[in-house]
UniProtKB/Swiss-Prot annotation:
Protein name stated in the entry: Phytochrome A type 3
PANTHER family: OS08G0260000 PROTEIN (PTHR47876), PHYTOCHROME 1 (PTHR47876:SF3)
Record's subunit section: Homodimer.
Name of one Pfam family that matches: HisKA
Sequence ranges assigned to domain GAF in this UniProt record: 217-402
Annotated family: Belongs to the phytochrome family.
InterPro entries: GAF, GAF-like_dom_sf, HATPase_C_sf, His_kinase_dom, HisK_dim/P_dom, PAS, PAS-like_dom_sf, PAS_2
Domain Histidine kinase: residue ranges: 902-1122
PROSITE patterns in UniProt: HIS_KIN (PS50109), PAS (PS50112), PHYTOCHROME_1 (PS00245), PHYTOCHROME_2 (PS50046)
Purpose of the protein: Regulatory photoreceptor which exists in two forms that are reversibly interconvertible by light: the Pr form that absorbs maximally in the red region of the spectrum and the Pfr form that absorbs maximally in the far-red region. Photoconversion of Pr to Pfr induces an array of morphogenic responses, whereas reconversion of Pfr to Pr cancels the induction of those responses. Pfr controls the expression of a number of nuclear genes including those encoding the small subunit of ribulose-bisphosphate carboxylase, chlorophyll A/B binding protein, protochlorophyllide reductase, rRNA, etc.
Organism of derivation: Avena sativa (Oat)
Keywords: Chromophore, Photoreceptor protein, Receptor, Repeat, Sensory transduction, Transcription, Transcription regulation
UniProt: phytochromobilin binding residues: 322
Amino acid sequence: MSSSRPASSSSSRNRQSSQARVLAQTTLDAELNAEYEESGDSFDYSKLVEAQRDGPPVQQGRSEKVIAYLQHIQKGKLIQTFGCLLALDEKSFNVIAFSENAPEMLTTVSHAVPSVDDPPRLGIGTNVRSLFSDQGATALHKALGFADVSLLNPILVQCKTSGKPFYAIVHRATGCLVVDFEPVKPTEFPATAAGALQSYKLAAKAISKIQSLPGGSMEVLCNTVVKEVFDLTGYDRVMAYKFHEDDHGEVFSEITKPGLEPYLGLHYPATDIPQAARLLFMKNKVRMICDCRARSIKVIEAEALPFDISLCGSALRAPHSCHLQYMENMNSIASLVMAVVVNENEEDDEAESEQPAQQQKKKKLWGLLVCHHESPRYVPFPLRYACEFLAQVFAVHVNREFELEKQLREKNILKMQTMLSDMLFREASPLTIVSGTPNIMDLVKCDGAALLYGGKVWRLRNAPTESQIHDIAFWLSDVHRDSTGLSTDSLHDAGYPGAAALGDMICGMAVAKINSKDILFWFRSHTAAEIRWGGAKNDPSDMDDSRRMHPRLSFKAFLEVVKMKSLPWSDYEMDAIHSLQLILRGTLNDASKPKREASLDNQIGDLKLDGLAELQAVTSEMVRLMETATVPILAVDGNGLVNGWNQKAAELTGLRVDDAIGRHILTLVEDSSVPVVQRMLYLALQGKEEKEVRFEVKTHGPKRDDGPVILVVNACASRDLHDHVVGVCFVAQDMTVHKLVMDKFTRVEGDYKAIIHNPNPLIPPIFGADEFGWCSEWNAAMTKLTGWNRDEVLDKMLLGEVFDSSNASCPLKNRDAFVSLCVLINSALAGEETEKAPFGFFDRSGKYIECLLSANRKENEGGLITGVFCFIHVASHELQHALQVQQASEQTSLKRLKAFSYMRHAINNPLSGMLYSRKALKNTDLNEEQMKQIHVGDNCHHQINKILADLDQDSITEKSSCLDLEMAEFLLQDVVVAAVSQVLITCQGKGIRISCNLPERFMKQSVYGDGVRLQQILSDFLFISVKFSPVGGSVEISSKLTKNSIGENLHLIDLELRIKHQGLGVPAELMAQMFEEDNKEQSEEGLSLLVSRNLLRLMNGDVRHLREAGVSTFIITAELASAPTAMGQ
């Protein structure tokens, strides 16, 4: 597939290409199925797949065959033998269709069950309630009355004639209700509760294991879930099967019993799992085949039904003969498959708005959890449901891994783009990003790259020859003349005539045109080179019977499909290439735009003024909020010393503000909370802000006897103007009363109603459910919060009717939120300790409520769990306001960071123009004095580049920052002249005379060190001296140079520079900022002096400031090494 660079967004491009791919693939599936049905024993799977790849494009005339194929898939009239099926009229509950084995299974008389009545007969028109005992019939009738009839699955019923128990599994189909009946085995303990809550206990251990994973590795996640499913179900083989972007599949993770051939690493063509089957997996997320050799059972329908009964939602639906043959060939007699459904586009996560699930983004099938067994195997419905829930939890974590991978990917690409941009700005030539390190191959994954520039070719690793590069460029100019870029996973399919000559090593290509003649290329080899084989049979050329559909034959077919193809280029890779293309065009554009330089100062000035005004307003608001908030707020500096303690914190703890300030935070919390606070403080100082952390604070004075104060805290890193973390602010919520209520509730069973229904505003919103999942409690605070009265929600299913991702009283944001709530509720019912979790739902009026939720088990006197109680905590208006202000502060910091990035990018373009102008001047007839001025300009240019590079430093003002020193030989005269030149215009404006009382020996001294940094330091202190000198004053520079021998031919030079100026001197506040004695916000001058002082300390030097009558002096010291030229003298 090849594509030019479109203007639409990557998500829309992705969606359109996906739809087109699915339509084309469905047609191919239909063709294969038709060939199979017609060919019989002569069916050759491998040849057909290869023929489809090389065949003509899909024609519209085949649509009838596709429709027939889809109808055949969806409307089969056969079921498997592990149960029986009834289809019921929705209004009367009379039978309108039944499987041939249903009468025998449901109405056979058992001699062990005495009966005086005639046994019921099962046929068309039979009322389903007549077949079962009263209790089972009532439960079934109740379930059939729900809008979501599957909500109570499985329903335990007993046959009236035989007394045999069955699981009734209900779902709605077009025009009717379909009920599967699966017998409960004598060895199986039946699930006595309606609904799915009991199934959770079966998967509780596996879910806890997945929940405890740290994240950051998709491979670890998949290996864990595969191992847990293997242990839970007992199948011989369990695999995590992942679909790739082009719909082909891969066994990503696998575990088997000893002796089985592994399939790990096998890739399968997209036709192995047809699109119609994938659609069914999206609707019915668990599929079980008990015995592929068993005879299927027919379904008998009433005559003249106005619709076809669809068995798509039935677990009993029989597999198609093609799939049965595949299973037989691979000796997989039984299988169990769970769908893993994730968000369709992880790139759009940040665009998700607070809307109910039905308005949310679509889902896609990420892959399957596949279980195989070498003998017939039946898994009861409760265990299947547990596996389905486990797959849902797994899908939530897959989504999280997508997000982590996306963040890491963006970070790495951004880092690489920055490094390549820096190289371009320094050299102003694309050759530097090809010949240097890193280079363009580090930007995206590829096997080779090339640059065509000025008619010449530069090649990297596995790239075509120079003549082939020219040939590709000619083809691009001829066929894709109007395109600024191109990406293809197959040059052969894209129509490049020379693709065959390139062979398998050059299949895919991405192109970025700098201009009509200069082009960047990236190349990829064929896909098979990327494929790994997981077992001993690692030679794909081993002979197989091409007529027997088998995993290794599918792998061979896949290799045929991907011949002459590479891995596809993803949207984020093309975005990275496109960004580099824009940078290259801007850097190499000879026609500069004068308006850019003129508008730059205005834009920077506006940003600066707006940013400072906004920051001052935010800071003032933060201070006011902290002092007046009705929630406790405390703050510490980088050493953990308290520098903020509001009145609410003082009121709760009994510790006055004056007594708290200056004390270490760890001395104020309970011993049991010290590790928690230490971790929270450490992470916050690293910029990682934890949320909803609970710890206990000591009480003092009159509050001492009340016990510790329990706080739930959000950590907010305090940052300075340059986004450096300088402390931590803790925005807390007092949970002491909440904890007392919970403790009292769990201890005193008889008092719970008085507590729950107390209208006291201190009582939080509380709701509960019994052990079967029915809502059993809903207090007054919950009614006020949600808008739903107690009698409107009691005796409804808590998970499904009260809370659900759609069609519930309180809709949740999406399916992931529902799964998380299920885990929390079921964990409490299983007796596990649960932590508070973020929770959100839409109230009756459609307003989205964000809160914390804690679930606690309810026990009877005997210690048996009889239900669950949930406590909701909603943040106060003050806390919400404080969080909004914090967000505004973070946005302001982000604005300033973007401004810095913009400045850095925009400044480099005019700097490149200045560099070009100076180089051009050097080639003209200049006298010695003019050449000196050009040399001064070059030195100032190097200084600017050095300062711009410092913007990458995370902590530029800290002594331990990564500011580097480059050792090179330089003349002290060059440093002084360049530094003085930077203040001459200011001196002329104020009438200040600047004099350099420097001896000739000093000026001609050649030394080793970082001359650019020394120049930066000297210019900073000169600027400050000039700024705070009176009009008409003077500034004097003097020096002292001492050599210390440390060997026969090596000397260390102790350099001392004095900058003396007239006037009152530099303000004390500025000096305090330079010497880090002032923790307040730093000014621009203070920051500049602090950075210069840190640089001096890296040079084993420092700065002192002397203030005398009418005169002030900076004394600068540094340690350098003498250069060889000086040693020779």
